[in-house]
Amino acid sequence: MIVKTKSGEIEGAKEDLYYSFRGIPYAEPPIGKNRWLAPKPIKPWSDVKSCKEFGSICPQNELVYEQEATADYETGSNQNEDCLTLNVWSSELNSNKPVLVWIHGGAYFLGSGADCLSDSEDICRDGKYVVVSMNYRLACFGFLRLIDLTDGKIPSTGNEALLDQIEALKWIQANISSFGGDPN
């Protein structure tokens, strides 16, 4: 299933009762000269981008207490600073359904947009909502204030993770109608 967004065309997967689009980039990768800075809107692409797999999650430590580790946490797989992606589940692409945006917990140092997978699928199967989850920078990648330590050379505010979430919400509002969601 191919959907056209303002960033470019993406290919998702048709599941039994819904469509899924995973690992959609919503901002430029926060690496190199973009590290420690506010997110920059994603530049449009020309090819069809495959969005059938979850994107990388922000680097994070394994859980301290082994008994806390459950299938809900994706701490062991595919960690990379290039993690600004989101996921969309929708039962109908030509509708105007309310949008449920899920921002994962984890005390701002662990977790990912994949943590809600089973809940998102269940909610989506119900047919009442379009569900979106996101990855954002965590721990020092998202909350390290460097502007004072570097005499302004690195203008990091220490709120880059929250700015990531805002950038994701902007992308969602601009593009969710392509997935059957109401942008308002």
Regions found by a protein language model. Name each.
Residues 179-184:
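Alpha/beta-hydrolase fold nucleophile elbow
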Residues 1-159:
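Non-catalytic accessory segments of hydrolases
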